[in-house]
Amino acid sequence: MPAWYDIHGLTFGSTEDEAGIRAAAQSLFHLIQKEIDSGIPANRIILAGFSQGGAMALYTALRYPHALAGILALSTYLPLHHFLEKEASVANKATPIFMAHGDEDNVVAPALGEFSYNCLKKLAYSVQFNRYPIGHSVCPQEMVDITQWLQQRLQK
């Protein structure tokens, strides 16, 4: 199955594929730049993803040098969180972040999502964390909440 990077484990203290994460972020930087080159301003771009894709959305957007419209990260965690304070882009310090997680997620533990949320709050990011009574999936209420959040970000 294709993946953004190798996952060695999804528990606290698991080894992370730093080189793979950084390489995937560079690919996303290039993809964002292609969108900008095609006429879409950075402040109209939202990076979004589920699970490992959500991890890459968080990692990449928080380091991207131009302000984005938002970050949507579902059933995920913040990879290489210990580097964020040093590597973060000032451009996306105020970028709204929507995180959501299932209370019954048996793939990415809800505690990892909550830990990531707390890391972001500690660094004064504009982040909200929503929990839902589901596993590693998306539910109808989550889709309603995502829709409202997206409409708020892109109404301008």
Question: Residue locations for each model-derived region?
Answer:
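Short, glycine/charged-enriched secondary-structure capping and boundary segments
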Residues: M1-P2, A61-P65, E85-S89, L112-F115, ...
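Serine-hydrolase catalytic machinery in alpha/beta-hydrolase-like enzymes
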Residues: M1-R44
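Amphipathic, non-transmembrane alpha-helical secondary structure
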Residues: R22-F29, Q33, L62, V144-T147, ...
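Primarily recognizes the serine-hydrolase "nucleophile elbow" in alpha/beta-hydrolase
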Residues: P41-N92
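Short, proline-enriched alpha-helix->beta-strand connector loops that line the catalytic pocket
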Residues: N92-I97, L123-S126
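Short beta-strand/loop motif that positions the catalytic acidic residue
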Residues: F98-H101, D105
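C-terminal catalytic histidine-bearing segment of alpha/beta-hydrolase fold enzymes
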Residues: A111-K156
